[in-house]
C-alpha cells in the first residue's frame, strides 16, 4: 500500500462475497452508476451494504464519488437517472460522465482495456478524463 498512490479493485456489479471483501480492505469506493432504470434500485442496496460494512468491518470506508456510466444523451432515461441521483444522493459526483460507446462494449471481448483497444475512442478519452479527475481529487 505504501508503494502505490492508488490501488484499484474492479468488482463485479453483484454484491457478492468478493465485493464485500474488497470493501473491507478498501479506503474508499468509486460507485459507477449505469444510466438505466434498475441501476437506481441497485444503488440503494449498495449504499445499505456500504453502511453495514462501515458499521461492522471497515469504519474508515468512504464513498470517494459517484460516476455515471453508459450515459446516452439521446434518451430521457439517462437524463432522469442523473437528475434523480444528483437530487437524492448526498455524495461527490464526478463531472466526467462515461457515455455508452460501442468500442467500450467491444474491448472486453478482445481481452483488452479500452485504452489499448481504441485509445482515441470517446470511451477511452472519457475514462482518461475520469482518471485525471480522481487523481486531482486525491491531491486535494
Where are the predicted features?
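Conserved catalytic-core segment of NTP-binding enzymes
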Residues: 1-102
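C-terminal boundary of histidine-terminating zinc-finger modules
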Residues: 107-129
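Hydrophobic "lid"/C-terminal helical patch
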Residues: 130-134
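Generic C-terminal helix-cap and adjacent flexible tail
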Residues: 135-140
Amino acid at each position: 500500500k505504501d508503494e502505490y498512490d492508488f490501488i484499484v479493485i474492479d468488482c463485479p456489479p453483484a454484491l457478492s462475497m468478493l465485493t464485500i471483501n474488497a470493501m473491507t480492505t478498501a479506503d474508499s469506493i468509486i460507485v459507477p452508476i449505469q444510466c438505466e432504470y434498475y441501476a437506481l434500485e441497485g444503488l440503494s442496496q449498495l449504499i445499505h451494504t456500504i453502511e453495514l460494512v462501515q458499521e461492522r468491518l471497515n469504519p474508515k470506508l468512504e464513498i470517494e464519488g459517484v460516476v455515471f456510466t453508459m450515459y446516452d444523451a439521446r434518451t430521457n432515461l439517462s437524463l432522469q437517472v442523473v437528475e434523480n441521483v444528483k437530487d437524492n444522493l448526498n455524495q461527490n459526483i464526478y463531472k466526467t460522465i462515461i457515455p455508452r460507446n460501442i468500442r467500450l462494449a467491444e474491448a472486453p471481448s478482445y481481452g483488452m482495456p479500452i485504452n489499448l483497444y481504441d485509445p482515441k475512442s470517446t470511451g477511452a478519452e472519457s475514462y482518461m478524463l475520469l482518471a485525471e479527475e480522481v487523481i486531482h481529487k486525491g491531491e486535494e
